[in-house]
Amino acid sequence: MLRSVWNFLKRHKKKCIFLGTVLGGVYILGKYGQKKIREIQEREAAEYIAQARRQYHFESNQRTCNMTVLSMLPTLREALMQQLNSESLTALLKNRPSNKLEIWEDLKIISFTRSIVAVYSTCMLVVLLRVQLNIIGGYIYLDNAAVGKNGTTILAPPDVQQQYLSSIQHLLGDGLTELITVIKQAVQKILGSVSLKHSLSLLDLEQKLKEIRNLVEQHKSSSWINKDGSKSLLCHYMMPDEETPLAVQACGLSPRDITTIKLLNETRDMLESPDFSTVLNTCLNRGFSRLLDNMAEFFRPTEQDLQHGNSMNSLSSVSLPLAKIIPIVNGQIHSVCSETPSHFVQDLLTMEQVKDFAANVYEAFSTPQQLEK
């Protein structure tokens, strides 16, 4: 039996060698293919896990953004009420002073200024914090992903994070003061000559707010000239035009200072982008729309109006004397700058444009390839 097999192999030696080579090649290719498939599967699994981890970190970061905004609103409200103290004027009016008309005129300007500044500053706070916390969030994600790797440098240590995020104080300090000045001038120009007895409908109020917005947003200090000659909406109030005090020092900067300056410059680039201006403008449109919605309940038709079958547009069918509108406007700050999630703040925090913009910022700063560009 063995001899006959051996004779067969000798007679078909070349064929057997060829067949053995083919079978061996198929076996090796099969093993190689299995290895490659396993490597691809492992790589895809690792990428999926990394993507899921990054998505989880992003969503957690957005919750942090929302909580940070809500936690800072009382500080913003207090700063506004301190600089635009209408309560002191209201207290004076209760004593029936001889200059009552003059005080009412001051109250008119301060009340409108305060509510309009509240809308602007709250919108700025929401969008600016989205930028800052997603930039720093991207760096933190990369730092966490690099834990355990040799030769890696922490991109955003805690002290840098604290120093960088403290730059929000410009919006709550000097930036807010400048914004108040500009808006107060615009309010004075549009409403200064309007009599307290003059009646305004909700539609009239909307038109007045549009006129004030146009003056504010076209003001020379409200537009930031970018490197390409374009203008960024209201960025001046969120970050100072001049170099940061750290950069002015020129020498003697610590590694922490250098990293902080890098983060601030990256933030500045984001604020100069067309996307930022678009998102901020969308927030402002929503904010002023919500402000009017809040006041609309005071302009509801009376039963007498309804009995007369008033078919006019509800926005213009009811008018109130300006003197009665002032207290309504004056109280809006408590809704706009409420740390308890109100419809106003919730609208801003849940806007799709804000979410998409935040995702783009986070994507840019949580991807190593993007940071290397």
Swiss-Prot record:
Function comment: Involved in peroxisome biosynthesis and integrity. Assembles membrane vesicles before the matrix proteins are translocated. As a docking factor for PEX19, is necessary for the import of peroxisomal membrane proteins in the peroxisomes.
Ranges facing Cytoplasmic side: 1-15, 141-373
Assembly and interaction partners: Interacts with PEX19.
Main location: membrane
Region of interest (Targeting to peroxisomes), residue spans: 1-45
Annotated organism of origin: Macaca fascicularis (Crab-eating macaque)
Protein name: Peroxisomal biogenesis factor 3
Coiled coil: none
